[in-house]
Amino acid sequence: MGEDTDTRKINHSFLRDHSYVTEADVISTVEFNHTGELLATGDKGGRVVIFQREPESKNAPHSQGEYDVYSTFQSHEPEFDYLKSLEIEEKINKIKWLPQQNAAHSLLSTNDKTIKLWKITERDKRPEGYNLKDEEGKLKDLSTVTSLQVPVLKPMDLMVEVSPRRTFANGHTYHINSISVNSDCETYMSADDLRINLWHLAITDRSFNIVDIKPANMEDLTEVITASEFHPHHCNLFVYSSSKGSLRLCDMRAAALCDKHSKLFEEPEDPSNRSFFSEIISSVSDVKFSHSGRYMLTRDYLTVKVWDLNMEARPIETYQVHDYLRSKLCSLYESDCIFDKFECAWNGSDSVIMTGAYNNFFRMFDRNTKRDVTLEASRESSKPRAVLKPRRVCVGGKRRRDDISVDSLDFTKKILHTAWHPAENIIAIAATNNLYIFQDKVNSDMH
C-alpha cells in the first residue's frame, strides 16, 4: 500500500439496476474461494451469484483480473415457522467455500435457520450414439436396430450445473450469524446468538452443541454471540466474539462443551470514555483469523483491532475507521445505524486490513507503514479502468476542494460486506445492490 494506494484502480462493477433498488437485490455476503478464481455473492432475495475470473489472454492483457458471471441459482426460499408463527427470511447470511477436492466446487450457504451444501460442476461434452436410445433419450424400437455402435462423447457448449447436496436444518433456535469450515475439511460450525453447533459435512440429521451461553433465566442474559471462526491451521481451535466486545478462544480437545474458554481477549474500558453508547459501539461485528493463524482481526462500530493470540490483555493494533462519528452517536442510535454490522478482511500477506464505512467509503490500513486510505465505491466516481482517488472526511475548519463534510455523509449508503483475494490485490466490495471489483494497477501492470 503506501504510495501505491493512489494507483489502485477499478476493473468493473456489476450493476443490477440503474433506476431503483429492490430489497431482494441488496447483497448480503461476499466470499472468494480458496484460489480466488471464483467469487460468490448472496443477496436478500435468497440468490447466490458466482463469478469466475477470466483467464489471461495475449490478445487482451488488461482483462487479467476481471470476473464474469459463472452461475446464478436460488439458494433459499422464504419459509414460515408455524410453531412460532414467524416468517423465515430467504436472505443469505453467509457463504463459505469448501476446499476443492476434485473438479467440482462446493459451497455452504445459510439463511437464518437452514444451511445448505451446494455442488457446482461443469459439462462440456455429451454422450451420443446409444444403441437402444435415440438422441432425446427415448427407447428405440428394437426391430429397427440393425447394427451396434460404440457411444462417443461429443463437445457441447459449456454448461454449469449447481445441485443441492445436503440440507442442514433444525439446528438453531435463534438466527444463524456465521458459519466456518474447519481445516480438517470434514466438519464445520454454525453460530447463532446463544449457541454454536459442530456439524459433519456428511451428516445432516444431527449436530453437536459446542458452545451454549443461554442462561437458565433469560432475564440474566447479558451478552450474545456475534461471530465465530475456526483457526485456519489447528482444527481443534475456534474463536467467537460477543456483543460485549470480548473474544473467547476455545480448544475442543479440552471438553465436549466449550463453555469454559482457553483464552479471553478483552480490552479494559477507559472510564473517561464511558457513555450510554459504550457497550453498543464495543460490540464485535466480525472476527477473522489471519492467514498465518497468529493474529485475529475484529471490527466494532468505530474501530478495527488486531489481536495477537499470545496476548489477551489488549489488542496490539487499533485503527480508527470513522472516529468523526463519535459526536453523532445519538442520531446514529435514533436511526438504528449504530447497530450496523461491518465486516473486515485481511490481504493475502496479512499486511493490510480492509473494512467498510458509510457514504460507500471503505478503509484500508497498512500495518507496516501505518498509512491508511479512504476510497469510494460508487458509479459516479468509478468508471471502468479509472484510478480511484483517496477521499477525505472533513470534521471542521478548512476544507480542501474534494473533501466531504461529516454532515453530508449518506448513511443509507454503507459498505458492510467486503472480501480480499487470498493471494492477489483484488478486492470485492458490496455496495447495496452493486458489486465492485477493484485491483491494484501496480499488480496488474506486472503481468
UniProtKB/Swiss-Prot annotation:
Function: The B regulatory subunit might modulate substrate selectivity and catalytic activity, and might also direct the localization of the catalytic enzyme to a particular subcellular compartment.
A cellular-component GO term for this protein: protein phosphatase type 2A complex
Gene: Ppp2r2c
PANTHER family xrefs: PROTEIN PHOSPHATASE PP2A REGULATORY SUBUNIT B
Matches recorded under SMART domains: WD40
Keywords: Repeat, WD repeat
GO molecular function, one term: protein phosphatase regulator activity
WD repeats: 22-61, 87-128, 171-209, 220-260, 279-317, 334-375, 410-446
Record's protein name: Serine/threonine-protein phosphatase 2A 55 kDa regulatory subunit B gamma isoform
Disulfide-linked positions: none
Subunit structure: PP2A consists of a common heterodimeric core enzyme, composed of a 36 kDa catalytic subunit (subunit C) and a 65 kDa constant regulatory subunit (PR65 or subunit A), that associates with a variety of regulatory subunits. Proteins that associate with the core dimer include three families of regulatory subunits B (the R2/B/PR55/B55, R3/B''/PR72/PR130/PR59 and R5/B'/B56 families), the 48 kDa variable regulatory subunit, viral proteins, and cell signaling molecules. Interacts with IER5.
Native organism: Mus musculus
UniProt similarity note: Belongs to the phosphatase 2A regulatory subunit B family.
Transmembrane segments: none
